[in-house]
């Protein structure tokens, strides 16, 4: 039992460095934006206690109950994330709901990208702005310093973060302990802030401010940004360590700091704008700025890694075109680098920093994508509860009304800042959604066209009856589906008038599970004297590799010797069939993405000297 406890404790320790980076750095700006933003709330006991009560109950209802107790129950072999939730919702739902669940998953992925653009800029700027508190004449240098940190952060992605990653957890542990210490010290001088644990103060605040509460709630949302990481990173650490880290250290530390900032506002007659840095004695200020900068870099790294992981999932689900994915660690499958995603995210983050220039300006843009993802996760959770968990309707309706109602309120509150900057993550999210939707739709259309072509069984029977010249060795033809005759096979027969001694029709099938067990990797069926059909199963967290595929086939009795196997692929050239402006635009965009997508031979690591590619024209 002792080793198991040590393992759980160590995983909980590591989870602090990855899972809670984003939500853990929220005290830098969340409370400040309520009382010192462009539309500040008056500093008085009713307002301070009301905001603290709202933050506390947001932690309880959104983070603790909704995500840690309910959403995390929906997993695929321990893996989580919004695309996983979407895939689970599609499994047993009626056909119309499957389509809706798929579109919601794609939309949430787009919003996650929009949030990922804001998070590094917001976090790093809010930390570096501490310099202006310690040395006001250094204020003009805040933006350049923050941008240099961002440039360095994105530059090291190609080298991987395995070496420095081991320091993430100790740094974040120190960060949370400092948060707790600073907050507890302030609470000692104004213990009356603890009365905000009573929900009556939140209710009184809402009644006091009426319709203006919506605007203020949009700022309270900043305290729970990053909550989706709890679910997305579940596969790396397990839900138990993530829960232990939250309830044992992260939540108490964050609440102590927020309540400490509230105590600071109540004890000083003229408090300054930076409520977080004002908690520290002057002698601690520079070390605290340095620690905050490290913590925000770690939070940004967690978001960047999350984008890489989400991009790989989307590619394997068929929502994005294939891209180059590099593994940066020999020991961890999760350590990956996606150059295209890294460059797009870097350019977007730099643009956002130049456009908004300060964390105060960025606060208006932050939050709306988060609440949109929360809303989508609640909608998908209702589908999962009804059709996957088989809950009865009264129970489903109860959680639906509770969480969808709460998320609607939060989404409406962040929408009040739409014109001040909230449009940016929404615009980015919608652009990503359109890209993913067009790719998925047109790719599905290609599969349907392929399925309407020649029957595989009839084609094989016809070929076996013909007397073709036989070449030595094995030919592997990649096909889109089991019912699809590879164009490369047809062209090989038409122009070379030859068949190999052994011919393998190979299909890659991506499963709604993170990883496929090696014994289930390959399904092999000999359909005639010289033809085999092979289905290779790939999880959405895996990368296909032809060397591994050949090894798995050998374990099942189909030996593919590297020096005796030839791979024949068709390289498609797509043409637009004129059917209307919107249709033509979608197909044109799909064709452009196809041209720039990673080639199948590169994605599968097929040796160039064993590869033959044949050009094929197809009209869409």
Curated annotation (Swiss-Prot):
Keywords for the protein's UniProt record, in alphabetical order: Cell inner membrane, Cell membrane, Ion transport, Membrane, Potassium, Potassium transport, Symport, Transmembrane, Transmembrane helix, Transport
Subcellular location: Cell inner membrane
Pfam families: K_trans, K_trans_C
Membrane topology: Multi-pass membrane protein
Principal cellular location given in the protein's record: membrane
InterPro entries registered for this protein in UniProt: K+_transporter (IPR003855), K_trans_C (IPR053952), K_trans_N (IPR053951), Kup (IPR023051)
An MF annotation (GO) of this entry: symporter activity
Catalytic activity: K(+)(in) + H(+)(in) = K(+)(out) + H(+)(out)
Domain of life, source organism: Bacteria
Bilayer-spanning residue ranges: 11-31, 51-71, 100-120, 138-158, 167-187, 202-222, 246-266, 288-308, 334-354, 364-384, 396-416, 418-438
GO CC, alphabetical: plasma membrane
Family: Belongs to the HAK/KUP transporter (TC 2.A.72) family.
Role according to the record: Transport of potassium into the cell. Likely operates as a K(+):H(+) symporter.
Protein name per the record: Probable potassium transport system protein Kup
Gene: kup
């Amino acid at each position: 039992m002792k080793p198991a406890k040590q393992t759980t404790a160590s995983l909980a320790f590591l989870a602090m460095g990855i899972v809670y980076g984003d939500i853990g750095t929220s005290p830098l700006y969340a409370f400040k934006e309520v009382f010192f933003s462009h539309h500040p709330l008056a500093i008085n006991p009713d307002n301070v206690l009301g905001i603290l009560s709202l933050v506390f109950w947001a932690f309880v209802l959104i983070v603790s109950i909704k995500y840690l107790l309910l959403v995390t129950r929906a997993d695929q072999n321990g893996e989580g994330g919004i695309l996983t939730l979407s895939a689970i919702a599609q499994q047993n739902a009626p056909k119309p709901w499957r389509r809706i669940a798929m579109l919601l998953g794609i939309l949430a992925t787009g919003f996650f990208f929009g949030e990922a653009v804001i998070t590094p800029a917001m976090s790093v700027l809010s930390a570096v702005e501490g310099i202006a508190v310690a040395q006001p004449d250094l204020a003009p240098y805040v933006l350049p310093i923050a941008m240099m940190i961002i440039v360095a952060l994105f530059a090291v992605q190609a080298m991987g973060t395995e070496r420095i990653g081991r320091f993430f957890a100790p740094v974040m542990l120190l960060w949370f302990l400092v948060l707790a210490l600073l907050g507890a010290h302030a609470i000692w001088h104004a213990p009356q802030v603890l009365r905000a644990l009573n929900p009556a103060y939140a209710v009184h605040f809402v009644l006091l401010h009426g319709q203006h509460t919506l605007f203020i709630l949009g700022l309270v949302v900043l305290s729970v940004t990053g909550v989706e990481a709890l679910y997305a990173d579940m596969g790396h650490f397990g839900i138990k360590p993530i829960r232990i880290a939250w309830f044992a250290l992260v939540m108490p530390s964050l609440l102590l700091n927020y309540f400490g900032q509230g105590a600071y506002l109540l004890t000083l007659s003229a408090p300054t704008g930076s409520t977080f840095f004002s908690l520290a004695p002057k002698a601690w200020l520079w070390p605290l700025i340095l620690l905050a900068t490290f913590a925000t870099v770690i939070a940004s790294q967690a978001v960047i890694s999350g984008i890489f992981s989400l991009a790989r999932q989307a590619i394997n689900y068929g929502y994005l075109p294939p891209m180059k994915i590099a593994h940066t660690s020999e020991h961890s499958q999760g350590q990956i680098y996606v150059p295209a995603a890294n460059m797009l995210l870097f350019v977007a983050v730099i643009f956002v920093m130049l456009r908004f220039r300060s964390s105060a300006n960025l606060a208006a843009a932050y939050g709306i994508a988060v609440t949109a993802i929360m809303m989508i996760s609640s909608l998908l959770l209702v589908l999962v509860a009804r059709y996957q968990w088989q809950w009865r309707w009264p129970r489903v309706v109860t959680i639906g009304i509770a969480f969808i109602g709460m998320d609607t309120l939060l989404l409406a509150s962040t929408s009040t800042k739409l014109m001040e900057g909230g449009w940016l993550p929404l615009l980015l999210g919608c652009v990503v959604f359109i890209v993913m939707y067009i790719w998925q739709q047109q790719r599905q259309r290609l599969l349907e066209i392929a399925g309407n072509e020649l029957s595989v069984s009839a084609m094989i029977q016809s070929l076996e009856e013909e007397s073709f010249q036989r070449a030595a060795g094995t030919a592997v033809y990649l096909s889109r589906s089991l019912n699809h005759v590879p164009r490369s096979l047809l062209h090989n027969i038409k122009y070379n008038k030859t068949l190999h001694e052994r011919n393998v029709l190979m299909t890659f099938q991506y499963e709604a599970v993170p990883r496929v067990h090696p014994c289930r990797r390959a399904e092999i069926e000999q359909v005639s004297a010289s033809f085999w059909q092979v289905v290779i199963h790939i999880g959405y967290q895996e990368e296909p590799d032809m060397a591994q595929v050949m090894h798995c086939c050998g374990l099942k009795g189909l030996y593919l010797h590297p020096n005796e196997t030839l791979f024949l692929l068709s390289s498609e050239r797509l043409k637009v069939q004129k059917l209307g402006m919107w249709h033509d635009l979608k197909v044109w965009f799909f064709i452009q993405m196809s041209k720039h997508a990673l080639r199948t031979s590169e994605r599968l690591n097929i040796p160039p000297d064993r590869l033959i590619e044949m050009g094929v024209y197809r009209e869409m």
